[in-house]
Amino acid sequence: GCPWDSWC
């Protein structure tokens, strides 16, 4: 779940 996470 970008932009909150890093696994975009």
From Swiss-Prot:
Domain of life: Eukaryota
Modified residues (Cysteine amide): C8
Cellular localisation: Secreted
Residue positions, PTM D-tryptophan: W4
4-hydroxyproline: residues bearing it: P3
Disulphide linkage map: C2-C8
Gene Ontology molecular function: ion channel regulator activity; toxin activity
Annotated tissue distribution: Expressed by the venom duct.
GO CC annotations on file: extracellular region
Key words, A-Z: Amidation, D-amino acid, Disulfide bond, Hydroxylation, Ion channel impairing toxin, Neurotoxin, Secreted, Toxin
Comment block on domains: The cysteine framework is C-C.
Misc. comment: Exists in two forms, due to cis-trans isomerization at 2-Cys-hydroxyPro-3. The cis conformation is the major form.
Family: Belongs to the O2 superfamily. Contryphan family.
Protein purpose: Its target is unknown, but this toxin may modulate voltage-activated calcium channels (Cav) or calcium-dependent potassium channels (KCa).
UniProt name for this protein: Contryphan-Fr2
